[in-house]
């Protein structure tokens, strides 16, 4: 039986003979041959292992080859629809860029630019000068530097200012910032020496003072943006640490994480420390992310006293961690939105989604509900109240009131419907609970409505 099946396997030349010549030219004959060899070899191996009891026909091998090459040509990084209600969704790319920032990236990608060219002097310039001015204007810092992410920013600052020196940190601030990336490990890699003070839930100013030695290089304060310690707690403010640091002539470094530039508590969100407040407290060097609460591209932004920033700029690691022209283009425009707070709230998608009026979200839900009425033979739709989250390791206590579209079906259960939506040509990521699939309208964009309709229609008609 096995020998008969192996003999029945079609030859490569025979399969090639039934391909359209245009397909061979478009994909390349060698590529098609290679894919066919893999397909036939897989079938041969399965026959020998007695996993299958059939040999592929020429037509079946051709179909598999076409499908495989089509999949190979698809983008791995693709558009998805975020129906989860998590605004800064780490796994879905974090913050979206504004229309203007997106256009700036496209322009930088499609044309030459003055990335490192001083147009006034007609000579080589610095890429950092393109963005340092706007960061200084918005934050009030003496100087600024941008690297490729906030973990890199922390590591670079510590290596530049505290190599082989002790850095004093509260035990309650030894955070893990995601992907098992922990402050102690970052510090170790930077060659700074960690000195832990206080306890997980309670640290006093005298703990910092008692830990000072001749080897002390800095105090480090880390904002616990992705968790909260409640109950019997005590922490020391940046202002208190800065007062002590001035007495002892020791620099203070603060990682405030998410990069909040405006007080969002006035919009009903949880109060988070802003970059400006940190600098006003007297912190010498502040680091934060560009693609979280700030709403821009992935970057680590370092601001603070010029004497410290200048030293950081001279570190050889700075070149290894530098940002490209796309990041600079996106970040510059995003930051310019902040020159007018109203413009920032309206134009930066992250801020706009977080501050959306509940009435507007309900209108979105009603609109989607009406769009989907034609699919009532496949599904039952309803609108429910729910909660969104900020995401991105930011504001863990903030629950944002929202409206959800609930999808029920008699023909497909919620697990399979979620999978079908996730595997659609434009993946739709949803929530599943209470025996149904839910779409949170807070994170649905204008172009998403039609895709959601088409996806549900195609799934229903299967």
Curated annotation (Swiss-Prot):
User: Among its keywords, does the record have DNA damage?
Assistant: no
Catalysed reaction(s) here are: L-seryl-tRNA(Sec) + selenophosphate + H(+) = L-selenocysteinyl-tRNA(Sec) + phosphate
Q: What is its EC number?
A: 2.9.1.1
Report the principal subcellular site.
cytoplasm
Can you list the GO cellular component terms from the UniProt entry?
cytoplasm
Task: Name the enzyme's class.
Answer: transferase
Q: Which PANTHER family match?
A: L-SERYL-TRNA(SEC) SELENIUM TRANSFERASE
> According to its UniProt entry, what is the function of this protein?
Converts seryl-tRNA(Sec) to selenocysteinyl-tRNA(Sec) required for selenoprotein biosynthesis.
| Protein name in UniProt | L-seryl-tRNA(Sec) selenium transferase
Q: What is the lineage of its organism?
A: Bacteria, Bacillati, Bacillota, Clostridia, Eubacteriales
């Amino acid at each position: 039986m096995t020998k008969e099946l192996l003999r029945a396997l079609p030859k490569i030349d025979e399969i090639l003979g039934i391909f359209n010549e245009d397909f061979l030219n478009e994909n390349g004959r060698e590529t098609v041959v290679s894919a066919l060899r893999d397909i036939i070899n897989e079938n041969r191996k399965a026959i020998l292992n007695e996993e299958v009891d059939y040999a592929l026909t020429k037509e079946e091998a051709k179909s598999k080859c076409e499908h495989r090459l089509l999949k190979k040509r698809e983008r791995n990084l693709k558009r998805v629809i975020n129906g989860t209600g998590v605004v800064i969704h780490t796994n879905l790319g974090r913050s979206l860029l504004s229309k203007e920032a997106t256009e700036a990236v496209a322009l930088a990608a499609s044309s030459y630019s003055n990335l490192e060219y001083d147009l006034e002097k007609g000579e080589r310039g610095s890429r950092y000068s393109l963005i340092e001015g706007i960061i200084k204007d918005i934050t009030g810092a003496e100087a600024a530097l941008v690297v490729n992410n906030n973990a890199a920013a922390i590591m670079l600052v510590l290596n530049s200012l505290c190599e082989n020196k002790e850095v004093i940190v509260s035990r309650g601030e030894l955070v893990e910032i995601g992907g098992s990336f922990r402050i102690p490990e970052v510090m170790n890699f930077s060659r700074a020496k960690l000195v832990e003070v206080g306890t997980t839930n309670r640290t006093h100013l005298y703990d910092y003072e008692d830990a000072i030695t001749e080897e002390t290089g800095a105090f480090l304060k880390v904002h616990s943006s992705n968790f909260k310690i409640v109950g019997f707690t005590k922490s020391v403010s940046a202002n208190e640490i800065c007062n002590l640091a001035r007495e002892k002539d020791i620099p203070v470094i603060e990682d405030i994480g998410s990069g909040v530039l405006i007080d969002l508590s006035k919009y009903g969100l949880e109060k988070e420390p802003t970059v400006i407040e940190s600098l006003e407290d007297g912190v010498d060097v502040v680091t934060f992310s560009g693609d979280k609460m700030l709403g821009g591209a992935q970057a680590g932004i370092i601001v603070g006293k010029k004497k410290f920033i200048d030293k950081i700029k001279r570190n050889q690691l700075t070149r290894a961690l530098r940002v490209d022209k796309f990041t600079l283009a996106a970040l510059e425009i995003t930051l310019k939105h902040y020159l007018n707070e109203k413009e920032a709230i309206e134009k930066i998608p992250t801020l706009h989604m977080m501050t959306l009026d509940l009435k507007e979200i309900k209108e979105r839900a009603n609109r989607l509900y009406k769009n989907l009425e034609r699919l009532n033979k496949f599904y039952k739709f309803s609108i429910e109240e729910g909660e969104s989250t900020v995401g991105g390791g930011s504001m863990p206590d903030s629950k944002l009131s929202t409206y959800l579209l609930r999808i029920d079906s008699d023909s497909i259960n919620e697990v399979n419907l979620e999978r079908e939506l996730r595997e659609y040509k434009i993946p739709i990521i949803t929530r599943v609970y209470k025996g149904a699939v839910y779409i949170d309208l807070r994170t649905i964009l204008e172009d998403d409505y039609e895709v959601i309709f088409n996806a549900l229609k195609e799934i229903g008609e299967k």
